[in-house]
């Protein structure tokens, strides 16, 4: 009985062993071809695990706007931007990306008012929905980018 099972299973195992290197080579070639850090076209197929994703309709996204407000309030609470004594006033989030980590990491570009000046900041916030918690990791003046 065991020899019949051997003769039935052995060819399948042999085929799998022969095909395994081919699939590994295809995966390695695909990973190398998409190693420029950019999102591929086609709806996200082939995305890198843990890569950043642009948030669509940032100004209409309530969660993103609330996180931007949280960052400005937290920045003021920590004593940042006291150059004129009043702190920052949140205007809006103008761009955002997400990254899945242990939770979701949001990369936000925030417009805020200080006196009569509109300033732009880059902030990073980690949200862990199961705790629930959110932590502002950084809040710094944005590097100048064309178009803003």
UniProtKB/Swiss-Prot annotation:
Name of this protein: Cysteine proteinase inhibitor 5
GO BP term (any one): defense response
Keywords: Plant defense, Protease inhibitor, Secreted, Signal, Thiol protease inhibitor
InterPro entries: Cystatin_dom (IPR000010), Cystatin_sf (IPR046350)
Subcellular location: Secreted
Positions marked as site (Reactive site): 50
Lineage: Eukaryota, Viridiplantae, Streptophyta, Embryophyta, Tracheophyta
Signal peptide per UniProt: 1-25
Molecular function terms, GO-annotated: cysteine-type endopeptidase inhibitor activity
Family according to the record: Belongs to the cystatin family. Phytocystatin subfamily.
């Amino acid at each position: 009985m065991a020899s019949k099972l051997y003769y039935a299973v052995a060819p399948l195992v042999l085929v799998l062993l022969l095909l395994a290197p081919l699939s590994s080579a295809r995966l390695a070639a695909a990973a190398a071809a998409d190693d420029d850090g950019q999102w591929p076209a086609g709806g996200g197929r082939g995305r890198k695990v843990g890569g950043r994703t642009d948030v669509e309709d940032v100004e209409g996204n309530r969660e993103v706007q609330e996180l931007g407000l949280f960052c400005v309030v937290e920045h003021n609470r920590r004593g940042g931007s006291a150059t004129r004594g009043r702190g920052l006033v949140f205007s809006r989030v103008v761009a955002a990306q997400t990254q899945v980590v242990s939770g979701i990491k949001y990369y936000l570009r925030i417009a805020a008012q200080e006196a009569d000046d509109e300033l732009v900041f880059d902030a990073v916030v980690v949200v862990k929905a199961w705790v629930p918690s959110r932590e502002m990791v950084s809040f710094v003046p944005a590097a100048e980018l064309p178009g803003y």
